[in-house]
């Protein structure tokens, strides 16, 4: 199994370590590779789009010619996990808590609506306990950093975890989106669930 991690910015190292832990837990002989240009997408079984600044990630991906290819592969069934800014990249509808609708480059493959900077500047980062029983796990303490919120889901998109009634983890077929940072959490539950998607 070969997992690619988009490596322009964001927590590449942290995702790498969580994936390694999940591989070890499941006794999977897996390979993890950084993805920056289209040829890096060749032969991968799944891809992670980490946090960072979603507009920057989109613009760099577009400039390096990977955005369209990524969209095509995800639409064709490549398992993907987008965390925080990565979730924004996957959404079909994006607006900003302050400025409203945005026109940033997106993959736009998931039937969700996301509001960027949902929790406002006062809560730039915080931790919260969420219930992961819908993915067969218990409660987990997770980290939110300038987090967005999934405010609407339609089609086959479904909510897997909420915080105060707002979706923070969603899935649609081969796509997993989190508004928190699972790579900064004590648990490998989210990465394990992603590997379960990859294994099919």
Curated annotation (Swiss-Prot):
Catalysed reaction equations from the record: aldehydo-D-ribose 5-phosphate + D-glyceraldehyde 3-phosphate + L-glutamine = pyridoxal 5'-phosphate + L-glutamate + phosphate + 3 H2O + H(+); L-glutamine + H2O = L-glutamate + NH4(+)
Keywords: Glutamine amidotransferase, Hydrolase, Lyase, Pyridoxal phosphate
Pathway: Cofactor biosynthesis; pyridoxal 5'-phosphate biosynthesis
E.C. number: 4.3.3.6, 3.5.1.2
InterPro entries: Class_I_gatase-like, PdxT/SNO, PdxT/SNO_CS
GO-annotated biological processes: glutamine catabolic process; pyridoxal phosphate biosynthetic process; pyridoxine metabolic process
Function: Catalyzes the hydrolysis of glutamine to glutamate and ammonia as part of the biosynthesis of pyridoxal 5'-phosphate. The resulting ammonia molecule is channeled to the active site of PdxS.
Protein family (similarity comment): Belongs to the glutaminase PdxT/SNO family.
NCBIfam families in alphabetical order: PLP_synth_Pdx2 (TIGR03800)
Protein name in UniProt: Pyridoxal 5'-phosphate synthase subunit PdxT
A matching Pfam family: SNO
Residues bound to L-glutamine: 52-54, 116, 145-146
Active-site residues per Swiss-Prot or TrEMBL entry: 84, 181, 183
Domain of life from the UniProt record: Archaea
Recorded coiled-coil stretches: none
Species this chain originates from: Saccharolobus islandicus (strain Y.G.57.14 / Yellowstone #1) (Sulfolobus islandicus)
GO cellular component: cytosol; glutaminase complex
A GO term, aspect molecular function: pyridoxal 5'-phosphate synthase (glutamine hydrolysing) activity
Gene from which this protein is expressed: pdxT
Subunit structure and binding partners: In the presence of PdxS, forms a dodecamer of heterodimers. Only shows activity in the heterodimer.
